[in-house]
Amino acid sequence: MEKTAQWQAQILTAKNSDWMRSNEYQSAIILYPVLKALNSKEADTLKTAMNYAWSLGEEVNTKLDILKESPKYNSEPPFDMAFRYAEPSDRMLKMTRKKFNLDKIAGKGDDISRIKNLLYRVHDNIEHDGSNGLAPGARNLENTYESARRNSCGYNCRALAICLTETLLAVGISARYITCIPKGWETDSDCHVICIAWSKSLNKWVWVDPTFAAYVTDENGIMLHPGEVRYRLQHDLPLILNEEANWNNRVKQTADYYLKEYMAKNLYFLETNIWNQAEPEGESNHPQGKTVTLVPVGLTYPHANYNTSNEKWFWQAPVIK
């Protein structure tokens, strides 16, 4: 055991060993407390090496470590603007509601069951293919669905999230799509796009991800929104991924990978559209909104129209008419 610690210390302090340092650091996290409990003389040496490796950069950090190190949010004065949600009486949403028979699909249950039914409908009818981008033409449910059928293909997470947002809005459920962005966005282009839907019964937003048919709950089965999931990841609080979560009905998802790896990486910055409607971006004949990104204090995301560190403002409730 002590020889193992000596080897790990050498790797953690060696030059040009980034490719090895990460694996050895994770092993050292397990070994160090054992050595400490045994009063081994190698415990302090290993701890010093771990601290040195940590100071060199993020190659030793897990994705969850990086999220936990994130600066906090604040209560800066909010923007003088409000999120907008298209009404189901909107011309395009009425067409969507009728064409896809959304009232029947949503069902007559409570709002949570309706949200889940629509989540599964989009997931089951438009496959995910991250390499295929968005459907050519209008960024709406009809065009994306018809294009996927016609070309026997899938589209990326953004396309699916835009479709689910439109589906929810069409039946009168306020919704937004959220682009989840990693800290290292300059070199890591792998973001993920999900939706949030407003639950009147819970009086809060809930996370719904059409790519993976996924939602997240606490230990009491209460659905959570991305901000709550982010906080719970940072503080090691219980998170439960629904059993049905999967990729294209072929690969089951687990909380360890989906939440603690994939989404832990992608919950560093959160971007959303101010105007939430059918065809919220891309080719469209109607005015479109600006984007705003929720950023930790002291950081900015330059691709957004606005940045804010006011978490309360970002997750504000929709005005229900």
Model-derived features with residue positions:
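Structural helix-adjacent loops and short alpha-helical linkers that scaffold large soluble proteins
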Residues: 40, 44, 106-110, 203-205
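Hydrophobic/aromatic-rich core segments of domains that either
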Residues: 162-238
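Secondary-structure boundary elements
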Residues: 54-155
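Low-complexity, Gly/Ser/Thr/Pro-rich intrinsically disordered linker/tail segments
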Residues: 235-321
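Short His-Asn-centered micro-motif
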Residues: 153-157, 178-180
